[in-house]
Amino acid sequence: MTGVLPVALEDATKVLQALLLTGKEYVCVMQLHGSVSSEVVQQVLSEFVGEIYQRPPLRSSVKRRIRTRWIYRISFLEMQENNVLFSVGCQAGTYIRKLCHDIGEALGCGAHMRELRRVRTGPFTEEKLSTLYDLADAYAAWAEKGDEFLLRKLISPMEFGLSLLPKIYIRDSAVDAICHGANLAIPGIVKVETEIKSSDIVAVFTQKGEAIALAKALLSTEGILDL
């Protein structure tokens, strides 16, 4: 597999768990084991949009028990002979090679994943990709000349990784308590985004836009505003 792989440094590693909540997008080449028309392929692909059941493949890092995952969209791109190119937006933890296998079963001919490229993880897209060579050059410029420009161009602020999460903004007087593990009380909240649901994971920010913590909402947006 090639494509987007976010790498976090120091305290920003805590943001990686938030990326699991924001979904991923892939472009995949699926090889069919028999001849099927493109119209039939498109019809079957559309049937996999929504909540699906998956058992992780034999080579996986988790227990092989059936679980549900969401497929937000599947787009048929093109087909050459028995090779189908499609893009898919899905919940984190979805196994695309297992998805290809299941699509092949639904088609009645069998199929396997031939190539896979991740084009988005949360807010990180291909447009923001950097190579290890880019990083090595940027580090050399900093180490040899003290020039931080290239490093700052490559490294996104921690707050960018949280940009797709619902946010709560708090008063400066509440920051220290939150940083020491205290619960956030209603008086400490300055602004809250809409569509927060109870039990959602939210990002807590200062009024200056600095990320402070990840938290679990005990109330919805409406519940917070009513208090």
Name every feature range the model reports, one short phrase each.
Residues 2, 22, 44, 64-66, ...:
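Accessory RNA 3′-end/elbow-binding domains used by RNA modification enzymes
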Residues 1-136, 179:
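Non-catalytic RNA-recognition surface used by pseudouridine synthases
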